[in-house]
Amino acid sequence: MLKNKVAVIYGAGGAVGSAVARAFAREGAKLFLTGRHRAPVETVAKEIDSASGRAETAEVDALDEQSVDRHLQSVIDKAGRIDISFNAVGIANTRLQGVPLVELKVEQFSLPIATYTRSYFLTARLAARRMVEKRSGVIMTVTSIPSRTGIPLMGGVAPAMSAVEALTRDLSAELAPQGIRVVGLRPQGMPDSGTIKEVFGLHAKAYGISWEQFQEMIASRTHGRRLTTLAEMANMAVFMASDGASAMTGTIVNLSLGSLDD
């Protein structure tokens, strides 16, 4: 589905980024994997290379405009174009969630909002400037269920996710006439992601239960009585990035297994 597509992935060393990288590689994409720390990204690239995929790595701070810009230009110099930009950056949730808003410091509240909106804006804007020349490309974002429904103890993460979804729609409104699609994924918490386990642990502690019990509680609210997996999210990302989804733009795909009505 993605044969010879050139894809840049931010946060490629994390659970979401690495899952998407493997899925893109399986479908024939040429990958340029990035992260703030090179070691975990190199691990993913080696795994892809060993499976006959194609992946190059770079240390890129997705909050640094010059760092992102230099890297994208290097991709253009090597591959000639950018077909897909997938941002999977994340920040540690310790002290950012699991605390009531009335007790949360303003710095803790503001951090995820500033971090996610800056990163998604920078990576999208700089990729779009290259994509416009070819009048084609796909920019992809990742959010979460709290962007659409009130959930206690989320701190500034929920407002950050809502902002990213608004940015996704606005980017699409401006870029679609120039051949660029902008789409987002909104998965339910994925228990095979280390980040989600950390988040579940923070919320479980506040409820006075184990993270396993908290996970069961969240899963019980879905139609399938289970949670989304990384593989399911990555498979959907493949379709959304492919030419088969050419009519899809300005939308956030709901991967909540029915726990959130559209």
Model features per residue range: what roles?
Residues G90-S110, E133, L153-G156:
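Conserved mid-core segment of classical short-chain dehydrogenase/reductases
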Residues V102-F121, S136, M140, V164:
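Catalytic Tyr-X3-Lys loop
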Residues A124, A160-V164, T168:
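Active-site helix of classical SDR
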Residues R129, A173-E174, S246:
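Alpha-helical segment proximal to the catalytic Tyr-Lys
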Residues S144:
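Residue(s) in the substrate-gating loop at a strand-loop-helix junction
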Residues A176, R181, M248-G250:
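Short, small/polar-rich loop/turn modules that mediate ligand/substrate recognition or access, typified
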